[in-house]
């Protein structure tokens, strides 16, 4: 959980000096296994925040690291294991959305192609060097990246299916917060929900 000084300026509702910004992950059950939308901070981030995360963001966001809040521990509390998570769909590769990737080593990781390219660029600016933390995802063995393009959907121009996932889970490009930022649309019981990441 991020608790930045600034309260309501950051989260829109806090009454005190500190804001409250949870690093949310979403778990979806499918016939192909569990699908995790973003991961939040991971076990290693909690154990060793330095050097995994930049001092700039650790201080600015006043991060409260709690092992019980990691996606892995919450999934285990539901009676599942890391191996049950077959897919991770990322809205983007910022440290607070991708930190738990390595907690699920057997999962296929889905992300927009432009996002992966931006995260791996050698000459990045001040913020990019601090937001993208390769140590969080450099051991991923199964990446699936997606170029812009696809089908129209509810006013969006280029929504697309994801390899190995049912058509009830879609990637929706939403560039802006990062070059390859995306939303993830999920259909459940005839209704669509859009996880807009940080858009």
Predicted regions, residues:
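Zn-dependent metallo-beta-lactamase
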Residues: 1-64, 139, 149-150
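Structural motif
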Residues: 33-35, 87, 191-195
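Active-site beta-strand termini and strand-to-loop segments that position acidic
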Residues: 28-31, 164-167, 186-189
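Active-site-proximal beta-strand elements of phosphoester/diester hydrolases
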Residues: 1, 36-38, 169-174, 194-197
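Cap/insert and terminal regions of metallo-dependent hydrolase folds
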Residues: 43, 58-73, 183-199
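Metallo-beta-lactamase
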Residues: 61-80, 84, 113-173
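Active-site metal-binding loops of divalent metal-dependent hydrolases
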Residues: 39-42, 93, 115, 176-178, ...
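Active-site metal-binding motif and surrounding structural segment of the metallo-beta-lactamase
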Residues: 50-111
């Amino acid at each position: 959980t991020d608790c930045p000084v600034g309260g309501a300026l950051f989260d829109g509702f806090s009454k005190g000096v500190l804001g409250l910004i949870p690093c949310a992950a979403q778990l979806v059950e499918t016939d192909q296994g569990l699908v995790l939308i973003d991961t939040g901070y991971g076990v290693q981030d909690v154990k060793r925040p330095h050097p995994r995360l930049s001092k700039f963001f650790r201080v600015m966001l006043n991060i409260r690291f709690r092992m019980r809040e990691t996606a892995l521990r919450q999934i285990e509390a539901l009676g599942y294991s890391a191996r049950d998570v077959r897919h991770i769909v990322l809205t983007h590769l910022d440290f607070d959305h991708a930190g738990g990737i390595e907690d699920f080593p057997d999962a296929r990781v889905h992300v927009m192609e432009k996002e992966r390219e931006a995260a791996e660029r050698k000459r990045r600016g001040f913020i990019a060097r601090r937001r993208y933390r390769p140590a969080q995802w450099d051991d991923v063995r199964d990446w699936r990246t997606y170029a812009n393009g696809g089908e129209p959907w509810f006013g969006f121009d280029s929504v697309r299916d994801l390899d190995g996932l049912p058509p009830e889970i879609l990637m929706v490009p939403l560039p802006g917060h990062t070059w390859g930022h995306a939303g993830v649309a999920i259909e459940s019981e005839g209704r669509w929900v859009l996880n807009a990441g940080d858009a």
